[in-house]
Amino acid sequence: MKTLLLTLVVVTIVCLDLGYTLKCNKLPPIASKTCPAGKNLCYKMFMMSDLTIPVKRGCIDVCPKNSLLVKYVCCNTDRCN
């Protein structure tokens, strides 16, 4: 009986995914990855010379400021980048 109860607890923890995990796209190639603890934003990085094609995607803790050469777009939902 204890084994059954322990099994149910383990299955519940695995299914509920205790501790929300954010999933962000990464580049290259486009695929998603689970962000580590503390990195709760997804980002896209563009070169200012071509704002149509992102050059980098991933997880980040703080959205960087844009510069003369690089623009960042950050968001906080799964695969939003």
UniProtKB/Swiss-Prot annotation:
Recorded GO CC terms: extracellular region; membrane; other organism cell membrane
Molecular function (Gene Ontology), one example: toxin activity
UniProt keyword terms in alphabetical order: Cardiotoxin, Cytolysis, Disulfide bond, Membrane, Secreted, Signal, Target cell membrane, Target membrane, Toxin
Stretch forming the signal peptide: 1-21
SUPFAM superfamilies registered for this protein in UniProt: Snake toxin-like
Compartmental location: Secreted; Target cell membrane
Predominant localisation class: secreted
Keyword Signal: yes
Role of this protein: Shows cytolytic activity on many different cells by forming pore in lipid membranes. In vivo, increases heart rate or kills the animal by cardiac arrest. In addition, it binds to heparin with high affinity, interacts with Kv channel-interacting protein 1 (KCNIP1) in a calcium-independent manner, and binds to integrin alpha-V/beta-3 (ITGAV/ITGB3) with moderate affinity.
Identification of the protein by name: Cytotoxin 1a
Species this chain originates from: Naja atra
